[in-house]
Amino acid sequence: MTFGWKLYGDGKTPPLGEAVAPDERLSWPRTVGIGAQHVVAMFGATFVFPLIMGLDANLAIMMSGVATIIFLLIVKNRVPSYLGTSAAFVGGVAAIRANGGDSSDVVGAILIAGVVLALVGVLIHFAGLGMINKVLPPAVTGAVVMLIGFNLAPVAAKTYWPQDQWVALATMTFVIVASLALRGFLARIAILLGLVFGYLLSVLLDATAGPITSVLGGATEATEHDRISFDTVGDADWIGTPDFTAPSFSVKFSLLVIPAVIALVAENVGHVKAVAEMTKRDLDPMMGRAVMADGVGTVIASAVGGSPTTTYAENIGVMAATRVYSTAAYYVAAIVAILLGLCPKFGALINIVPGGVLGGITVVLYGMIGLLGAKIWKENRVDFANPINLVPLAAGIIIGIGDVTLTFSDDFSLNGIALGSIVAVVAWHLARALAPADMKAALLREGTHPASGSTLGHGSDAPDPSSVDEVGRPGVTDGRTPGTGAHSR
């Protein structure tokens, strides 16, 4: 591994059809500019999901920078990626809080899941990806991703939406229109733009229509309140550290978030393959390292109260649009994120996002997460005419979405995402073992890549990053192999 990035040509924007490789860079001013684009790309989801999970958004942004640097070091600067907040844990976190857990319980459970993810990465590194494909075929992976997303429907419907239904409706509508009407990079940040729109709309309504009467999150009775209050912003310091939270550990709560590991493995593998396709480099030897690095990043972030991390499709999209794959730009983005995390006033501004705005955003995001499970099925040609796929996965999905509970004792039970995921995995393998030979043979015609195209919970409205050219038009994949341009050494 080296930090001595080679200067690409004269350090200016690469010509049409050429690209800047991971071990190259443009001039430092241009590299800083590319890094700024990566900050904007990751920003929306990186602070929206901590807010939804009840964690400190400022700390999440800061630790995303730390996790990104750790990731780049572990993969030896060969896999350019940014680690932002993962959406895969939102359902498990909601279940923890519904069962009386607090933020310490949440980050403790996430830390355990991070350890499991890191161990899976080690297993992939030494045993190969084939073992994971056997345990978690696309049919099962898609089912787990789907139940994670759709299990969250009551959170959006009962917690956020009722706080301000009209702002929620307006925000949701804006996100839908923006994702369709805008093009290129702006379409990829439709969620962030929707949040800004809802934020400003709430300020305008407070000024013109006055306070609103509704039930705030966690309350049982309706009260009159402003949609947004800037008191905490005025009281916050300009420079300081975020609020840290020490983790506490519980087997019950850990089991609620461990199913997210399945989604993260699929997501990481899919993203590494997308980067490999764009850079025209063989990154299969880095697959295990990338998964392990994501796990390590999650462990370190959650150890101080931060959010879980994952590689971001939005940032892969920025690389596809600019054809600048330099890891130097990611170090710049990570440093900027760390500095933003050290500004409490910035964090206070984030933490006062109105509940109605989150209501409009979450109905879109949670639905997108669930439908990405169907995307995995489609891209891997999963055959639901085959009872091996249809029957066990149907049971697992309904158990997960319906929040069915299996009680073992007064102190221990499984429900929702955890129980649904276990049923989906175990019942599928049991059905496969008991099925006649012709049903087993039909499975061989399905795809074998559990992560094909999956981008869990963010960036899914963007085109496939591996088929976007330098100006963001989908479907153009030609161009020279990165690293073939002239260098100044």
What kind of feature is each model-predicted range?
Residues 418-489:
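Terminal cytosolic tails of multi-pass membrane transporters
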Residues 55-61, 77-90, 132-141, 187-193, ...:
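Short, non-helical or kinked segments that cap or interrupt transmembrane helices
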Residues 18-32, 49-72, 256-327:
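Membrane-embedded helical hairpins/re-entrant loop segments and their flanking transmembrane helices
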Residues 9-10, 15, 43-46, 174-178, ...:
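Juxtamembrane interface elements at the cytosolic ends of transmembrane helices
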Residues 100-208, 334-442:
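Membrane-embedded alpha-helical modules
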Residues 1-80, 88-100:
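N-terminal signal-anchor module of multipass membrane proteins
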